[in-house]
From Swiss-Prot:
Record protein name field: Undecaprenyl-diphosphatase
Domain of life according to the entry: Bacteria
GO process annotations (BP): cell wall organization; peptidoglycan biosynthetic process; regulation of cell shape; response to antibiotic
Family according to the record: Belongs to the UppP family.
Main subcellular location of this protein, as a coarse class: membrane
More info: Bacitracin is thought to be involved in the inhibition of peptidoglycan synthesis by sequestering undecaprenyl diphosphate, thereby reducing the pool of lipid carrier available.
Compartments where found: Cell membrane
Membrane protein topology class: Multi-pass membrane protein
Protein source organism: Mycobacterium sp. (strain KMS)
A Pfam cross-reference name: BacA
Length: 276
């Protein structure tokens, strides 16, 4: 992997990780179209560590408050507030993707990264996002979250294992279908992603240095630089996206996903780019 590839893919990762457009799908598309190869699932997982650190920094106060409330609630049942419960919902919501991710790790690294599958997922899941925006009542706030919300949004997060779906798109859509307001749906989804993405990144770290049969390999310094770039770009992206989401919703991204999916299908149909 050249340094140009590293920089371009890191910027793509940072820009798209928090948008409902699928960062893993974009990395696969950009890699194939411009560099005639796939960055690989391991490179994707490791660079996601940079964007998740960006989430940690951006939501540091929220995370600190939730963690404090959770430990306080364990010691003193009389002080179990909404933040204490939110801590449990994040834990509960992380379980599904942990189990499914381990069971399907081989498929995620290979078959699911086919550009035909990614293009179709981009288009099909656009309908889900649009439906969530249209039917979501957005009347529930953090005090009204329940363990059921944690389970459902956690299960929805499993869809992010398929490139082309989008983690934020899946979790925010699930939250909207459950009646959560847009900002809560986004914040809860981002918090839910932190343990899952960190576990995935650390698990994939050894493979990222020498992926066999799954794409371009990156050196240690390249992975470090890519992760730092993804952090910087990702921090700016999450700050912008939350403001944009509250004001405008996700319809703009629905249109973008459909256009991108159609373009990729055309490139595949005409033989301009290979599916795998």
């Amino acid at each position: 992997m050249s340094w140009l590839q590293v920089i371009v893919l890191a910027v793509v990762q940072g820009l798209t990780e928090f948008l409902p457009v699928s960062s893993s799908g974009h990395l696969a598309i950009v890699s194939r179209v411009f560099f005639d190869d796939d960055a690989g699932a391991s490179f994707t997982a490791v660079t996601q560590l940079g964007t998740e650190v960006a989430v940690l920094v951006y939501f540091a106060r929220d995370i600190g408050r939730i963690a404090t409330a959770w430990f306080r609630g364990l010691r003193n049942p009389g002080r179990r507030d909404a933040d204490y419960r939110l801590g449990w919902y994040v834990i509960i919501g992380t379980i599904p993707i942990g189990v499914i991710g381990l069971l399907l790790k081989d498929e995620i690294r290979t078959a699911a990264r086919n550009l035909w599958a990614i293009a179709i997922a981009l288009i099909v899941f656009s309908a889900v996002i649009a439906a969530a925006e249209y039917f979501g009542r957005q009347v529930r706030h953090v005090e009204q979250l329940t363990w059921r919300d944690g389970v459902i949004v956690g299960v929805a997060q499993c869809l992010a294992l398929l490139p082309g779906v989008s983690r934020s798109g899946a979790t925010i859509s699930a939250g909207l279908f459950l009646g959560l307001d847009r900002e809560l749906a986004a914040r809860f989804g981002f918090l839910l992603a932190i343990p899952a993405v960190f576990a995935s990144g650390l698990f994939s770290l050894p493979d990222a240095f020498a992926p066999v049969g799954e794409g371009m390999s990156a050196t240690g310094p390249q992975l470090l630089v890519a992760t730092v770039i993804a952090f910087v770009v990702g921090f700016a992206a999450v700050a912008w996206f939350l403001r944009f989401l509250v004001r405008h919703g996700m319809y703009w991204f629905v249109g973008y996903r459909v256009v991108l999916g159609v373009v990729v299908l055309i490139l595949l149909s005409t033989g301009v780019v290979a599916a795998i």
